[in-house]
């Protein structure tokens, strides 16, 4: 059990004899491999421009992945049955196991109650910036909620993604500011928050569930790019300004902004604020439309390239940046 590592017990390990490996939900590309869509995997390995002709097929499969998530058992059952509804029992069993583990291993009744509350109701806040005190009208104090979140974060069930205010490396999270809640698997979020039908019926994932599920799945795909256990995601927010960019990613010792947004380029005010103070000239927008590249000029006159990357190409983001810079 992941939650077994939450017990207040000191365990000694032989120095230099323990190797830590990151075990994460399956990525979209792993999902395609599991359902034998090797033809689409071959297309995704080509230059991004080549994916345009297959855009509808690729987005259909990505929407399926966003609904199902990356839990191996859920994907295996879907691969065998092609029935999205049939995998609900997998989600129910997993979530109940996490709740039982919290009660079994967490020391202290208050911490147990708070952790169980988060595991019951916290899914509805996926992709949102949250306040710890009185989280979800729970009545719990900030410290109690913070302790429970850190406990669940240590178990790799979720991550509190904190903002950075600099547009340069290194990435230093500002932990005194409000974090964004990202759960470890989108399929579980959809099931627990009761929004699967909305995602299934949506024509644009960015617009579904107020855009939060699009941020959640983007964060999940970004984390799948890294194999370091301690890797954390971050977003950018300028203090006292209101400008906020959904995520930032480091590439070749530089920080690149990522917006998850549909619509016209005129709606990218925060991205332009970031670029005006950045030392890069490439920004990324994740959306549901085909791959394209625009040239944008900020209000202050800086020109940069905006790479419009469909969701199914998030896994190629470093390759795309290599080609652009």
What spans do the regions from the language model cover?
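Conserved nucleotide-binding/hydrolysis micro-motifs of P-loop NTPases
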Residues: 2-5, 25-29, 165, 188-189, ...
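Switch/connector loops and helix/strand junctions flanking conserved nucleotide-binding motifs
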Residues: 4-9, 29-33, 267-268, 292-297
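Interdomain motor-coupling "hinge/lid" segment immediately C-terminal to the ATP-binding subdomain
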Residues: 7-124
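Hydrophobic/aromatic beta-strand patches that form the interior of the parallel beta-sheet core
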Residues: 19-21, 182, 258, 282-286
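Accessory nucleic acid-recognition modules appended to NTPase machines
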Residues: 76-249
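Conserved catalytic cores of phosphodiester-cleaving nucleases, focusing on short active-site segments
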Residues: 218, 222, 245-264, 283
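Catalytic cores of nucleic-acid endonucleases
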Residues: 262-305
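Domain-level recognition of nuclease-like catalytic cores that cleave nucleotide substrates
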Residues: 291-325
């Amino acid at each position: 059990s992941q939650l077994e590592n939450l017990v207040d017990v000191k365990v000694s390990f032989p120095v230099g004899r323990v190797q830590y490996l990151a075990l994460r939900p399956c990525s979209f590309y792993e999902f395609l491999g599991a359902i034998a869509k090797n033809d689409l995997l071959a297309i995704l390995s080509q230059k991004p421009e080549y994916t345009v002709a297959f855009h509808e097929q690729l987005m259909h499969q990505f929407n399926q992945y966003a609904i199902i998530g990356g839990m191996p058992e859920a994907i295996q059952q879907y691969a065998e049955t092609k029935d999205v509804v049939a995998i609900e029992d997998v989600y129910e069993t997993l979530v109940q196991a996490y709740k039982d583990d919290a009660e079994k291993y967490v020391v202290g009744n208050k911490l147990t109650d708070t952790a169980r509350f988060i595991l019951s109701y916290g899914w509805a806040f996926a992709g949102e910036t949250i306040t710890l005190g009185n989280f979800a009208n729970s009545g719990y104090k900030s410290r109690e909620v913070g302790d429970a979140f850190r406990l669940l974060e240590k178990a790799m069930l979720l991550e509190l993604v904190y903002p950075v205010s600099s547009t340069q490396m290194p990435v230093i999270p500002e932990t005194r500011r409000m974090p964004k809640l990202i759960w470890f698997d989108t399929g579980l979020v959809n099931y627990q928050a009761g929004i699967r039908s909305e995602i299934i019926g949506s024509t644009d994932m960015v617009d579904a569930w107020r855009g939060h599920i699009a941020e959640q799945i983007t964060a999940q795909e970004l984390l799948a790019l890294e194999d370091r256990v301690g890797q954390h995601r971050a977003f950018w927010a300028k203090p006292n300004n209101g400008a906020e960019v959904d995520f930032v990613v480091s590439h070749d010792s530089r920080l690149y902004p990522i917006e998850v947004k549909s619509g016209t380029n005129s709606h990218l005010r925060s991205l332009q604020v970031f670029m005006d103070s950045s030392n890069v000239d490439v920004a990324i927008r994740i959306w549901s439309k085909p791959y394209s590249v625009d040239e944008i000029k900020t209000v202050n006159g800086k020109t940069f390239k905006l790479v419009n990357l469909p969701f199914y190409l998030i896994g190629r983001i470093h390759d795309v940046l290599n080609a652009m810079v």
